């Protein structure tokens, strides 16, 4: 996946890369990596094991042309949304359409059936089925990637400790005193 920079004046810039607790993420080291390579003369870079895209994103912010790669499809989607995409965004009306159930659309219940009582409540699983179907129905691949990325981030935030390594929905649903 190659970052296109045909129209740099339309490039989307952000000051902060979205964080996750993704095992193996280089986000914690990205400033150190940049410090080590910034004086090397180069215009392009290959991020062969792109993962969350934190290194590619930083290089893009520094004006470098980045080729991003990752074997996992959801990471490929993140790369398309944050690295390859230069000027596509979602409007408020598009977000509203994504978050709404539509009478003329048939929604599967795959997430609701498959992941019952594992990561999210039944209502949240139904909502995920609706939103993921609406994303698949979008025509623009960059808008799809942005929407999926936002959905991934919202799913991570909703999880205890931002992790998916075990069935622990009960941790979030317990009625206990919290210090945060």
Task: Please annotate each region the language model reported.
Residues 65, 71-180:
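Class I S-adenosyl-L-methionine-dependent methyltransferase module
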């Amino acid at each position: 996946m190659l970052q296109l920079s045909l129209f740099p004046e339309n490039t989307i810039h952000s000051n902060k890369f979205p964080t996750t607790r993704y095992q193996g993420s280089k986000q914690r080291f990205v400033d150190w990596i940049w410090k080590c390579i910034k004086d090397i003369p180069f215009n392009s870079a290959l991020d062969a094991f792109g993962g969350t895209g934190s290194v590619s994103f930083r290089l893009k912010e520094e004006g470098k042309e980045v080729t991003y790669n990752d074997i996992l499809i959801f990471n490929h989607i993140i790369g398309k949304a944050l690295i390859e995409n230069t000027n596509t965004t979602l409007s408020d009306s598009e977000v509203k359409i994504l978050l709404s159930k539509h009478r003329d659309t048939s929604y599967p219940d795959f997430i609701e059936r498959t992941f019952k009582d594992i990561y999210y409540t039944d209502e949240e699983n139904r909502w995920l089925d609706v939103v993921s179907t609406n994303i698949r129905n979008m025509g623009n691949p960059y808008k799809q990637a942005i929407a999926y990325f936002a959905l991934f981030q919202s799913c991570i935030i909703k999880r205890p400790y931002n992790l998916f390594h075990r069935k622990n929905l009960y941790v979030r649903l317990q009625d206990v005193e919290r210090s945060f």
